[in-house]
Amino acid sequence: EGELAVVIGRIGKDVPKARWREVVFGYTCANDVSARDLQRSDGQWTRAKGFDTFCPLGPWIETDFDPSNVDVTTRLDSLGGGDELKQNGSTSDMFFKAPEIIEYISSFMTLLPGDVILTGTPDGVGPMFPGDKVSVAVEGIGTLTNPVVSADDSE
């Protein structure tokens, strides 16, 4: 799941939408990996999204950036199927924009410097297999590319 990630730079509690930028340090690409089999069997997402190598971020943090209308794409370069565009969306189409997300989350938890908030993913998520490569691109930030490896090969 390719997503825009917001990196928090200042402590924030009950941050109103009008002041959301005051707590943001910058933005980066996120690959929100899920183990769908565990997600289905557990009935919730903590373990399915909590493995050590899940949710890579990068390639860097962009501090001078307007997240309101940028493209977010995810490509899967699979051993069996070649390079395929899996997700293509714009942040302008998100159900909840960064100001609303920050206002909501900070209403029940204090945001701390270094916290990362994922903003949601376009349609098109799908399975990945060992040997594949996943590339998440956010227009104006760059591209994050990660290999898919099995748990046995991840050390």
Locate the predicted segments by residue:
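Short, basic and Ser/Thr-rich N-terminal targeting/leader segments
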Residues: 1-2, 23, 55, 68
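N-terminal accessory regions of nucleic-acid-interacting proteins
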Residues: 13-27
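Short, structured patches in soluble enzyme cores that scaffold and shape functional sites
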Residues: 2-4, 8-10, 28-33, 61, ...
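Short beta-strand segments in beta-sandwich/barrel cores
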Residues: 11-13, 142
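Residues on a specific face of well-ordered alpha-helices
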Residues: 22, 28-31, 36, 55
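Catalytic-pocket segment enriched in acidic/His residues
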Residues: 36-155
